[in-house]
Amino acid sequence: MQMKYLIPIFFLVLIVADHCHAFLGMIPGLIGGLISAFKGRRKRDITSQIEQYRNLQKREAELEDILANLPVY
């Protein structure tokens, strides 16, 4: 084979090997995520989300009050 054909093939094999290596490294994390999803460990608690939203609204209102009381230069 000529060199102009070997170099692209080499880079193609290098890229494919890199992607396969990255995929193999992700498999344990994916399996763990699936197991925890099926067991229901990561269920979201809606009450905590509501409290976070209320706290965010309260902080936004306080910030608006502070900015309204600042003198304009």
UniProtKB/Swiss-Prot annotation:
GO biological process: defense response to bacterium; defense response to fungus; killing of cells of another organism
Main location, first listed in the record: secreted
Note: The primary structure of the mature peptide is identical to that of NDBP4.23 from Tityus serrulatus (AC S6D3A7). Negative results: does not show antifungal activity against Candida glabrata (ATCC90030) (MIC>400 uM).
Domain of life: Eukaryota
Signal peptide per UniProt: 1-22
CC per GO annotation: extracellular region
Residue positions assigned to the propeptide: 45-73
Tissue/organ expression: Expressed by the venom gland.
Name used for this protein in its record: Putative antimicrobial peptide clone 4
